[in-house]
A protein has these predicted regions:
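Helix-to-loop junction immediately C-terminal to a conserved catalytic motif
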Residues: 59, 314
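Conserved ABC transporter NBD signature motif
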Residues: 67-82, 322-330, 339
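Catalytic Walker B motif of ABC-type/P-loop ATPase nucleotide-binding domains
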Residues: 170-174, 420-424
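Helix N-cap at the start of a conserved alpha-helix in ABC-type nucleotide-binding domains
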Residues: 181-183, 431-433
Length: 468
């Protein structure tokens, strides 16, 4: 008879209030879950439903490091997690933002570090590091610093480090988010190898299009988990209502616009070359033009240089050679602040552009810095557009990933620039967040805004004006 890997009974958990005049934030009520050893389980839920919190609880990170009130039974490998955090050789965790768990000076050191803390012999460490690098296609990057990797490469590195440690249980918070098709295939193969060897896999996700229907599923909604069922047994309308993203059809709402090739250029590149200091060349003599009003997708695998390219459009990076022109002006002769009047930028990781104390202050900052007119009206409209009025005085840092993304979109709405650059805007979004983003893009496009979307999704050819 299989042993129980994870057992949760009548669990209730609330985070402490972020302000003295507020009530605790109740996340779970009467939660029940049972997973046997060597089983793979998928927890589906919308952004903010508590998927990440569930991983924190099972790893012993919450409430130990987060604070909060926990009642009920929570056992991992038959040990009470409330009494003792599970040791890393038993439980490994992949955070939703993999970059937060990378901290060493190189890719190979990142993989080796966890093995060293477990007391693995040096010769065995070398073998496991090389095997992990090969398994997750990181051999050519072994000496590179983790911060220099793309978002998808960082995700693969974090998974490679966990894979090398061979834990009995893996808690994987949206493990496929932000990965291109090759990266997803590598991750699936690595996880399947661990599962075949006897590991227990608990995955969370906010969408269904990347998962095998045979995997047992629990739906997390209204602070509780559903009964365990096969994914195909969950009606799509129920999933959509719960905020889960189903196989996307929303991109079909974008009909191709009339040809705008003869329109004046929004972005023009001439022999653009770029090389990071002490690093390899990334861009090699690029030439292309994006006319005003076009919807353009820049497509490529993780690490291909997509983010590096678009950061030239708003002056965050400057060419090593060649030129970039924005609205017919040489970008190298304009400051980042000046370019911000013409180009708004959505980072791949929303928390990188959130820094104010409240959501309202975050949306206000850009228009006020640029002395734009009607700042209060801009902020009010942006809050209303993304249903953020009730969160206007909350700190952005305490919001879920999907809501942080909505805040960043609200800031771009308030700026109302003629060019929008969005770096992997769909990564990590649940069904509601994806639908909200697509509606917003449709509105921007109808208003004549130039849209430049960086993506690893290869299925947009029929929906965009052009793919690069």
């Amino acid at each position: 008879m299989s042993k129980t890997a994870i057992s949760i009974k009548d669990l209730q958990f609330a985070y402490p209030p972020w302000s003295p005049d507020l009530e605790p934030a109740q996340i779970f009520e009467h939660l029940d879950l049972s997973i046997t050893q060597s089983e793979e389980r998928l927890i589906l839920g919308a952004s903010g439903s508590g998927k990440s919190t569930l991983c924190y609880l099972l790893a012993g990170l919450a409430p130990t490091y987060t604070g909060g009130t926990l009642t009920g039974e929570l056992r991992v490998l038959e040990q009470d997690v409330r009494a003792r955090c599970p040791p890393p050789q038993h439980v490994g965790v992949l955070f939703q933002d993999a970059a937060t768990q990378l901290f060493t000076s190189s890719v190979e050191h990142e993989i080796a570090w966890g093995l060293e803390t477990l007391g693995v012999p040096p010769t065995e460490i070398g073998f496991r590091v090389t095997a992990a690098l090969r398994k997750f296609d990181l051999l050519t990057m072994r000496t590179r610093p983790p911060w220099a990797l793309s978002g998808g490469q960082r995700k693969r590195l974090a998974l490679a480090a966990l894979w090398a440690q061979q834990p009995e249980i893996l808690l994987l918070d949206e493990p496929l988010a932000g990965l291109d098709p090759d990266g997803r295939a590598e991750v699936r193969a690595g996880l399947e190898q661990l599962r075949t060897a006897g590991a227990t896999l608990l995955k969370t996700d906010s969408h269904t299009d990347d998962d095998v229907p045979a995997v047992p599923v629990n739906l997390l909604e209204a602070k509780r988990l559903s009964e365990t069922v096969a994914l195909k047994a969950l009606p799509q309308q129920h999933l959509i209502k719960a905020g889960v993203r189903v196989p996307p059809k929303a991109w079909q709402a974008f009909a191709k616009s009339q040809s705008t090739i003869k329109a004046s250029p929004a972005i023009e590149l001439r022999q653009l070359r770029f090389k990071y200091q002490d690093g390899p060349a990334v861009l090699h003599g690029l030439d292309f033009l994006i006319p005003r009003g076009q919807f353009v997708a820049i497509v490529g695998s993780n690490g291909a240089g997509k983010s590096t390219l678009v950061r030239h459009f708003n002056g965050l990076l400057r060419p090593t050679r060649g030129s970039v022109r924005v609205l017919a002006q040489d970008a190298s002769r304009r400051s980042v602040g000046e370019l911000a009047r013409d180009v708004s930028f959505l980072f791949q990781r929303p928390e990188r552009q959130l820094f104010a104390n409240t959501v309202r202050e975050e949306i206000t900052y850009g228009p006020r810095q640029l002395n734009l007119p009607n700042v209060e009206d801009r902020v009010a409209r942006s809050l209303a557009r993304f249903d953020l009025e009730s969160l206007a005085d909350r700190p952005p840092a305490l919001l879920s990933y999907g809501i942080q993304r909505a805040v960043t979109l609200a800031t771009l709405t308030a700026m109302d620039t003629p060019i929008l650059v969005l770096d992997e805007p769909l990564a990590g979004l649940d069904g509601r967040g994806r639908a909200q983003l697509l509606r917003w893009l449709a509105e921007r496009r109808a208003a004549g805004i130039t849209l430049i979307v960086v993506t690893y999704e290869m299925k947009l050819e029929a929906q965009v004006d052009r793919m690069i």
